[in-house]
Amino acid sequence: MKHSKKLLLCISFLLITIFISGCGFINKDDSKETEIKKSFNKTLSMYPIKNLEDLYDKEGYRDEEFNKNDKGTWVITSSINIQQKGEGLKTRRMVLFMNRNTRTSKGKFMITEVKEKSDIGFQTRKKEYPVKLIDNKFIPSKQIKDEKIKKEIENFKFFSQYGNFKDLKDYKDGEVSYNPNAPNYSAKYQLSNNDYNVKQIRKRYDIPTEQAPKLLLKGTGDLKGSSTGSKNIEFTFVEKKGENIYFTDSVEYTPSGDDK
């Protein structure tokens, strides 16, 4: 009888220990997810940036990589990437370097198609159009004969100009990954087609699928914040062999000199 009681106590103690440990892991994951959200919020809280030129007067996170006389450069990127069955991966991408020292912005609009050829491997076709930003408007730096592309550049909007993450704190059940040795971190969330940002992307691009995307927040560098790291947002609609549809965006604050 005494042995039975001891055995029962041991089992009870073991179950309680496992339960507490499990709660600890859950709390740890929740804590890391909260940290990742806070890290991204430093950038995402700026969205939407109606007037990009406001960034000339906004300073990002600085660390020892910055020269004390360097005001820094904002690097903004948005791209839509579509690969349908039997076709190559087609990408339309805009990147802009906003130098706070000179208060000037230059960049380029790129159209790329990558196809896999059985005889030569991958074949890449790429066209680049240099651009500048004046009075919050994109202007081609060189003459463009193709009026359709010219209009696309002039009417272009970065995701950071219309995206809104005010509800980021309410995103739940994220798949969290953190590697302090790399260092890198990420959080992934399943969205619905009713999500505000998803609607905005579909409004601006012809997304050839009704499938709702997953949102991936992906960062490198110190989780607490580092000017040498990066933060990227990715909306993945389709991801499988021979078929991919995804939209990417990033806003980074870097030491000047990277905008070559």
Curated annotation (Swiss-Prot):
Concerning InterPro entries, the annotation shows:
Csa (IPR007595), Csa_sf (IPR038641)
Positions of S-diacylglycerol cysteine lipidation: 23
What's in the GO CC field? plasma membrane
- Membrane topology classification: Lipid-anchor
Residues annotated as signal peptide: 1-22
Where it sits in the cell: the answer is:
Cell membrane
Major location (coarse): membrane
Q: Where is the lipid attached (N-palmitoyl cysteine)?
A: 23
Q: Which UniProt keywords apply?
A: Cell membrane, Lipoprotein, Membrane, Palmitate, Signal
Q: What is the similarity comment for this entry? A: Belongs to the staphylococcal tandem lipoprotein family.
The name on file for this protein is Uncharacterized lipoprotein SERP2451
Q: Which organism is it from?
A: Staphylococcus epidermidis (strain ATCC 35984 / DSM 28319 / BCRC 17069 / CCUG 31568 / BM 3577 / RP62A)
